Amino acid sequence: MEAKKDKAQQVADVSHLLSTSAGFVIFDYTSMSAIEATSIRKKLFKNGSKIKVIKNNILRRALKAGKFEGIDETAIKGKLAVAVGVNEIVETLKAVDGVVKAKEAMNFVCGYFDNRAFNSADLEKIAKLPGRNELYGMFLSVLQAPLRKFLYALEAVKAAK
């Protein structure tokens, strides 16, 4: 009886962790070494994110309890870890993607953020997108280019006189 209460508490804790986060990514960590696990934990910690290894049955129940619609529960099998993004889920996804790319046996299973479920193919595409700071840089360079051209034109007119 005590074991059931303990499992129910674990389900509640995991459900609370997932529902209060910005999003999460579930991935297969089958061939990840201890060094790679430490590396990914450090990268995620810098982003304010965390990684948890949760039993599949508890994870399935937590997903049901949290009402995360669209997640394929049949995909929750094998050795899985959950990367939970507290602030910025895209940075969390990129950190996990760096390790997943290095190992062929590892792959994304599914993810959930912005009130939407994503499959592994979607997560791989999103991980290839530039991050927030890179997008800001691109945007500013686009804004700066016309001003720079205008200044060069003014200098050319000034030099012509």
From Swiss-Prot:
Keywords: Ribonucleoprotein, Ribosomal protein, RNA-binding, rRNA-binding. GO terms for molecular function: large ribosomal subunit rRNA binding; structural constituent of ribosome. GO terms for biological process: translation. Belongs to the universal ribosomal protein uL10 family. Forms part of the ribosomal stalk, playing a central role in the interaction of the ribosome with GTP-bound translation factors. Part of the ribosomal stalk of the 50S ribosomal subunit. The N-terminus interacts with L11 and the large rRNA to form the base of the stalk. The C-terminus forms an elongated spine to which L12 dimers bind in a sequential fashion forming a multimeric L10(L12)X complex. This is Large ribosomal subunit protein uL10. It comes from Mycoplasma pneumoniae (strain ATCC 29342 / M129 / Subtype 1) (Mycoplasmoides pneumoniae). The lineage of its organism: Bacteria, Bacillati, Mycoplasmatota, Mycoplasmoidales, Mycoplasmoidaceae.
